[in-house]
Amino acid sequence: HENNDFLHLCGVSLTGVVRRPDLGPYELRLLRNAAIMGAYSMADELGLPRPKNVTTLKPEGTISKCYDTTEGAHKPLARHIFNNVTFVKHDPLVPVLREAGYKIMPHPNGTGDWVITLPVAWDDVDFEKVGDLEVNEETAIDQLERYKLLMDNYVEQNCSITVSYDPSEVDAIVEWLLQYWDHYVGVSFLLRADPLKTAADLGFPYLPQQPVSKAEYDAYVASLKPIDLERVQAQSEDAVDMGNECAGGACPIR
């Protein structure tokens, strides 16, 4: 709280970065300057101190799903993906999705929740063909270069990115960090998973994201029925319980 009173930091972020390879240093600086001037003008109008920093780049996992775009600065795992998403057991979407033909399985945590398979495709992102799949084989250095581009031209705080790498790339990563240390604040590193392996191959009941072939993706999408969103909204409203247990202003989790 004290830091916020002193710094007045903003968090104006970007998402879907890999879908816009046309955005170079000039365009990113225009975006940064627009965000800064907007924040400064609002601070001046409200009689508040101007923020120390305005722009950042967050993980953007949840909001990107709402926007139907790629997450922050990250490149997707593959062109065609089955996203296995957890829904709580009383979510009104569950029966609607079941009737529409979506694959639904009980969550292995045993709480009564559900795991529902949602198909996702990225037709405007470049991938490498490996067998029947089109997957992300981007090198660690390419990911770090994207981080540097954003840090140099848009970000004032830090760019959140998890760099997937192979052990054979460690020497190149160290060399890059030493060369560009002044451009670097901090990133996460994660050993690259083999996109060709399934949940069964890895000993898990399911994977949060499973790369699939175009044929498998198309077959699943073709099996799905349209969803009546008005019905979903009505069921969501009906699901609100305003009984005595809600009298204190907070309803219990169902």
PLM region spans:
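Residue microenvironments linked to proteolytic maturation
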Residues: 13
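Internal maturation/activation junctions in enzymes
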Residues: 1, 16-59
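Short acidic, low-complexity intrinsically disordered linear motifs used
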Residues: 238-254
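A generic structural signal for well-ordered coil/turn residues at beta-strand boundaries
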Residues: 50-51, 61, 157-159, 247
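Short capping micro-motif at the N-terminus of alpha-helices
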Residues: 52, 65-66
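Catalytic alpha/beta core of large soluble enzyme barrels
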Residues: 1, 6-8, 59, 66-239
